[in-house]
């Protein structure tokens, strides 16, 4: 425990909280343009071809974003919305594309967990 005299000479330093999603700049989502759409492989022990895209955001940042769901319609110059949220087995991927917003279509034939994939309620 520091004495009052020590605290007068040198006050306590606040811890700086580092953001996990710096490119969002404290916004819930950001818009951007796809510069490259490709697949990449996850870290061990997983094996797949994960769909990701490189995005130039409106604030000038260039980030890599994961495209969730089965199948997508994104290509170069597509305008997309991204949100925070990393992909644990893809190093360097800290953002998700929002399905069903702007140029990114919702997942086709999705019946459950629809809100996460931008799908409207089906006509029963």
Curated annotation (Swiss-Prot):
GO terms for cellular component: small ribosomal subunit. CDD domains: Ribosomal_S12. GO terms for biological process: translation. Pfam families: Ribosom_S12_S23. Disulfide bonds: none annotated. The modification 3-methylthioaspartic acid is found at residue 89. Keywords: Methylation, Ribonucleoprotein, Ribosomal protein, RNA-binding, rRNA-binding, tRNA-binding. GO terms for molecular function: rRNA binding; structural constituent of ribosome; tRNA binding. HAMAP family: Ribosomal_uS12_B. Part of the 30S ribosomal subunit. Contacts proteins S8 and S17. May interact with IF1 in the 30S initiation complex. This is Small ribosomal subunit protein uS12. It comes from Pasteurella multocida (strain Pm70). The gene is rpsL.
């Amino acid at each position: 425990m520091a004495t009052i005299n020590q605290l007068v000479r040198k006050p306590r330093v606040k811890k700086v909280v580092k953001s996990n999603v710096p490119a969002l700049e404290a916004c819930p989502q950001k818009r951007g343009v796809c510069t490259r759409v490709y697949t990449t492989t996850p870290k061990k022990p997983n094996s797949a071809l994960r769909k990701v895209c490189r995005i130039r955001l409106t604030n000038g940042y260039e980030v890599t974003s994961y495209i969730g769901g089965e199948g997508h319609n994104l290509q170069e110059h597509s305008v997309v919305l991204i949100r925070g949220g990393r992909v644990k087995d893809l190093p360097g991927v800290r953002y998700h594309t929002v399905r069903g917003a702007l140029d990114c279509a919702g997942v086709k034939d999705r019946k459950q967990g629809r809100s996460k994939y931008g799908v409207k309620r089906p006509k029963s």
